[in-house]
């Protein structure tokens, strides 16, 4: 487990992509760059020169807080954080990034999700089949654990 490579995508709302990018840049002590494109993306480099992206996701029901009330927000409040290729030692960094984003108004709702991509180079077909079967049989338990 500790020698696997992975990537993570975390969907959120409550703050704009620009504010999320500035939060991430502040965390890393770098700067945010608006790269635009079809996902209206922002890019932030970390100390290892890896690029973290903040992109839009059309499936997110955008919201923000106004005077303590959660209200509908425009599409700039659709935020998906896309990590670079990560390793086990990055788990603490990811936790701290999420905390920083939450301190700056990030929130989630039922339209938000987390996607974890695990490098397959260490798994043969039987391993992949076993993992798929475990995930399928424990899907409800995993879902409850993430709520």
Residue ranges and their predicted role:
Residues 1-147:
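Phosphate/nucleotide-binding catalytic core
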